[in-house]
């Protein structure tokens, strides 16, 4: 039986190749996690609050606004984010300090290797996927679960679909026949005007009130991302 022996030069070349492969993989993951931590994030819708347009298990690519929090001296009024009525946004209602870059990078790595099924940050944050309806200066009201918006400077209000830049359908709950429309969350809401840096977000399924009807208007810093693309399921893949 013959034995094969490689020369010292061959072994050195092989080790050199292995080091380059390991270094390449390391650079790829560091670049990926840093990039996704600062500029993009992938999220899974875990409930039916956005029915009938979005379904539980849908997976999305969001643009991330979190990198603005790393720039010192940027106030809410100076955050250069172009938010549009009707867009799907990522809302973080966590009241504490935002996770740092290291935490986000580590979280991105864990999310990558677990196919977005586990997150360190989401255990500490309150992350929601919602529909953005109102911008600063808008007058917001609700009639029979349909939001009406009077855009700042306009003399009259329009329905949310008329002012939206995106097409979507809302799901209106069926209330009991004797339900009092004056009760909270009955589908009606008196007009109010959004202040500076205030936004109104809501669920497409109006039976779910875990939105601005409960929280009140949200700050630009609560809106941490804008949905760009649904990549799963494949049958629904496309821009939002």
Q: Which ranges hold each PLM region?
A:
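N-terminal, active-site-proximal structural segment of metallo-dependent hydrolase catalytic domains
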Residues: 45-48
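Hydrophobic membrane-insertion alpha-helices, especially the h-region
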Residues: 20-38
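Soluble "head" domains of membrane/secretory-pathway proteins
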Residues: 2-19, 38-41, 51, 55-240
């Amino acid at each position: 039986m013959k034995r094969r022996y490689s020369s010292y030069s061959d072994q050195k070349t092989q080790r050199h190749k292995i080091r380059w492969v390991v270094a390449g993989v390391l650079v790829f993951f560091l670049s990926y996690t840093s990039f996704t931590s600062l500029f993009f994030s992938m999220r899974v819708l875990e409930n039916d609050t956005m029915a009938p347009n979005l379904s539980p298990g849908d997976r999305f690519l969001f643009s991330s606004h979190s990198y603005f929090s790393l720039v010192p001296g940027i106030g809410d009024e100076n955050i250069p984010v172009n938010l549009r009525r009707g867009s799907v946004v990522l809302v973080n209602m966590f009241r504490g300090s935002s996770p740092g870059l290291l935490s986000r990078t580590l979280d991105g790595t864990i999310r990558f290797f677990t196919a977005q099924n586990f997150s360190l940050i989401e255990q500490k944050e309150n992350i929601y996927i919602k529909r953005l309806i109102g911008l600063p200066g808008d007058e917001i009201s609700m009639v029979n679960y349909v939001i009406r918006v009077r855009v700042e400077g306009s003399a009259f209000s329009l329905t949310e679909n008329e002012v939206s830049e995106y097409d979507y359908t809302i799901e209106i709950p069926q209330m009991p026949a004797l339900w009092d429309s004056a009760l909270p969350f009955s589908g009606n809401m008196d007009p109010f005007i959004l202040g500076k840096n205030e936004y109104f977000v809501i669920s497409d399924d109006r039976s779910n009130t875990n939105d601005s009807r409960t929280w009140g208007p949200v700050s630009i810093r609560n809106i941490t991302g804008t949905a760009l693309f649904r990549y799963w399921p494949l049958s629904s893949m496309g821009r939002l």
